[in-house]
Amino acid sequence: MLDFSLFVWYHRLCNYTKYLFRIIRFWTIKRKELSFMEALKYPPILEEFLNYFSTVKARSPNTIKAYAYDLILFFRFLKKRRGKVSDDIPFDEIDISDVDIDLIESVDLNDLYAYLSFVTNERSNTPPARARKVASLRSFYNYLYRKAKVISKNPTQELESPKLSVRHPIYLTLEESKKLLNSIDGPFKERDYAIITLFLNCGLRVSELVNINLDDIKEDKLTVIGKGNKQRTIYLNEACIKAISDYLKVRPKEGVKDKKALFLSKRLKRISVKTVQYLVKKHLKHANLEGKKYSAHKLRHTAATLMYRYGNVDIRTLQKLLGHSNVSTTQIYTHVDDSQLREAVNKNPLSQE
């Protein structure tokens, strides 16, 4: 008779193997894309645009890479559409170094919609991916028209972005948040408790948390560097101050490799994003909360939702606290849940009739 535990072990091994192969395949493709982009010769106008957004606009490296990828794809499509390359050249090998202002200015609205149709049908782009490409095109043509002043018309002014479905953020309820905090245990209890407390109270990004230095905290003020290297001040409440204070009492002082870092790994280095993501998942599992796709970033959603619902925080204040450049990003936290809908109906003056 087959041992059931052996069957379970074999089933898990198969799942882990499939997951591992997916990761390897993803990073193999991504590495090829990045290495090819680095070796590619950009047209001068694209380099000028990327330099402007990198230095003057202080966009993050990931944003600059996204702009470059989207515009390289667009230039290749444009050359193919204009018949400027032979049919035997693979699409991803089309040279774009000769793209000039005349070609760029010749683009009209029909070309732009043809491009979006191409990335939908040939590249299987989802609505969010197409929306990003629209944003990249708008930024590029706005730069050429308003800043560089090298084109006489902007074809993206009438370009519509794909309609995106509204997704409510995944977040922990107040009771689940308390359950998570109360379940934290282990050899790094104080550190992990401080980390999760900051997530739940301040709505930090993971990248912001791992980069906190000791001197970034002055009494009840925490200074963080967010997206686009933008600095913002977050005021710490009593729970955060106490959690940090308790952690600092046990924070290692000898053999520390990064003395500036607030949060340290077991190897006495600055804690990594991967470690933070792991420890959050570990404590979620310990609190029996792992089945709802919660993660470290979902704790940021939780903080925003709880502040909006229980703290009477207006949307503009929440935008500043979270470090959003656009208030439309913050508006996803103005959702209501079933209990609020039920409460609204029960407040109807006719509900007792």
From Swiss-Prot:
A GO-annotated cellular component: cytoplasm
Primary subcellular site in the record, as a coarse category: cytoplasm
Organism superkingdom: Bacteria
Entry coiled-coil feature ranges: none
The entry's keywords: Cell cycle, Cell division, Chromosome partition, Cytoplasm, DNA integration, DNA recombination, DNA-binding
Domain Core-binding (CB) per the UniProt entry, residue ranges: 40-145
Subcellular location(s) of the protein: Cytoplasm
UniProt GO MF annotations: DNA binding
GO biological process: cell division; chromosome segregation; DNA integration; DNA recombination
Domain Tyr recombinase positions: 167-346
Pfam families given in the database record: Phage_int_SAM_1 (PF02899), Phage_integrase (PF00589)
Function summary: Site-specific tyrosine recombinase, which acts by catalyzing the cutting and rejoining of the recombining DNA molecules.
Protein family per UniProt: Belongs to the 'phage' integrase family.
Protein's name in the database: Tyrosine recombinase XerC
Organism for this UniProt entry: Caldanaerobacter subterraneus subsp. tengcongensis (strain DSM 15242 / JCM 11007 / NBRC 100824 / MB4) (Thermoanaerobacter tengcongensis)
Gene: xerC
